[in-house]
């Protein structure tokens, strides 16, 4: 499952087939093609591009492992990126880690995870009881209701990342600064 939020619309890229095979490779290629096209269109329009994630450590792992896993076996799939292409992207100034910004700007006595920080911005998830572990259970359940809940959860994670980004850009309104404690 890959997901992106462009500021207006959540774009899910999901396969419900067994993982590790052609269906997963095609899904990854669909996501990468959408991302590449979106970035190129922005550049062509004279815009700057920022692709934001919450914790690039995990995202980099999944991007690289997907490229590594599928590059040789499914080279016939259009849009499937090479390891070199993924490495160039994650090393580019367009790939931005919101969590790194959060760690630099905020202190959190209960942590700085997305759910904690996004709630401080006023964001809430439609799927209140879903977290990373529960999302795996939803995927494995495979029912239409579980799939809908998983896509809702992933979409909310994407929108929550945008909410945290806006919150930080606005100066984290409503939160005390370290100067308040000096």
Q: Which functions belong to the PLM regions below?
A:
Residues 4, 15-136:
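Conserved DEDDh/DEDDy metal-dependent 3′-5′ exonuclease domain
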Residues 106, 117-181:
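Acidic, Mg2+-coordinating catalytic module of metal-dependent nucleases/exonucleases
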Residues 1-13:
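Active-site cores of enzymes that catalyze phosphoryl transfer or operate on phosphate-rich substrates
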Residues 7, 83, 175-178:
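Intrinsically disordered, low-complexity, compositionally biased regions/tails
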């Amino acid at each position: 499952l890959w997901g992106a939020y462009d500021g207006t619309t959540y774009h899910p890229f999901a396969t419900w087939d067994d993982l590790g095979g052609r269906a997963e490779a095609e899904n990854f290629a669909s996501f990468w093609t959408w991302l590449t096209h979106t970035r190129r269109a922005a550049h062509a329009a004279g815009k700057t591009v920022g692709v934001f994630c919450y914790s690039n450590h995990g995202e980099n792992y999944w991007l690289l492992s997907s490229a590594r896993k599928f590059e040789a076996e499914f080279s016939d799939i259009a849009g499937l990126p090479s390891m070199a292409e993924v490495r160039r992207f994650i090393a580019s100034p367009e790939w931005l880690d919101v969590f790194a910004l959060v760690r630099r700007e905020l202190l959190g006595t209960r942590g700085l995870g997305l759910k904690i920080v996004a709630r401080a911005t006023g964001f809430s998830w439609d799927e209140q009881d879903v977290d990373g572990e529960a999302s795996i259970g939803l995927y494995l359940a495979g029912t239409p209701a579980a799939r809908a809940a998983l896509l809702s959860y992933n979409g909310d994670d994407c929108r929550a990342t945008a909410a945290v980004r806006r919150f930080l850009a606005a100066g984290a309104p409503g939160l005390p600064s370290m100067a308040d404690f000096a």
